[in-house]
């Protein structure tokens, strides 16, 4: 039993993508010289650029969570909060701060709910770092520390890195998915976006020589 527990579980065979193959220029845009957001360790990166204040992102989130749960181990999902300025800025800082302080998983959906459903977090006028810190304090962190971390050098670095990736990927709206830094998905809706991403992931997998026995 111990030996079985220590042996790596066999990787699930990737599910063949559904629907028609995507068309370059219509379903996705090739990013010239595109690179993943961060080192992938040989995995296929899927970056979702989103904003907490974006209603479409709030609606997309449950679909993304379900989609993520079905991805095989060779897919690396990365969420990036877009620092587009205005009310995007404080909530992007909050995202990267929550990530840094280890409370992102338990707060991610809660922030969407607080902005779009409960209206307990403001959009206009802009929330202060202290207001945002007070919100996150309900999830087990020190609110004052959270607020000060939002303005820290480390978070500035994350904001800058995200901005650079978003700019070089040509992303100007949310939610947007970028596959392996090479393809910006331009689907006509949420399900269409995920379908296109599935095809592009399969394409990248095949290009890496990771095609399955079934030829997918």
Region locations from a protein language model:
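C-terminal cap of thioredoxin/glutaredoxin-like
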Residues: 1, 137-216
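Extracytoplasmic thiol/disulfide redox context detector
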Residues: 1-86, 206-216
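A structural motif
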Residues: 101-107, 135-142
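Short N-terminal micro-motifs specific to bacterial/archaeal maturation
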Residues: 37-40, 85, 123, 137, ...
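Structural alpha/beta surface segment adjacent to cysteine/selenocysteine redox centers
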Residues: 48, 58-130, 167, 203, ...
